[in-house]
């Protein structure tokens, strides 16, 4: 069963691009679609994954280390907590590839 989720982060586009560069170009296993939108106070991430386990593996093995690396390079000595994640029941996805 697919997994759809949303979370907001207090980051700008430049920080997002640095995190993406740290993650690399390889498409994460199980990712169906990932959107990033400007939102009040930062960026909103919307993801659709094959499963919650695929999202969690990507978060733990790729996203979290990349965020820590970028924030440490920016001078952070403590890492902020993970943002709250809202989960949704996925009804449909249309993509024009």
Regions found by a protein language model. Give the residues of each.
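Short S/T/G/P-rich N-terminal loop/turn motif that feeds into the first structured element of a domain
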Residues: 1-46, 50-68, 72-97
């Amino acid at each position: 069963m697919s997994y759809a989720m949303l979370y907001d982060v207090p980051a700008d586009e430049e920080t997002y691009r640095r995190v993406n560069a740290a993650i690399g170009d390889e498409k994460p296993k199980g990712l169906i679609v990932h959107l990033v939108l400007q939102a009040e106070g930062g960026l909103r991430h919307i993801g659709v994954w094959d499963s919650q386990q695929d999202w969690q593996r990507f978060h733990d093995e790729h996203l979290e280390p990349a965020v820590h690396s970028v924030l440490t390079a920016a001078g952070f000595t403590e890492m902020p907590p993970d943002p709250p994640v809202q989960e949704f029941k996925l009804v449909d996805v249309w993509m024009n590839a």
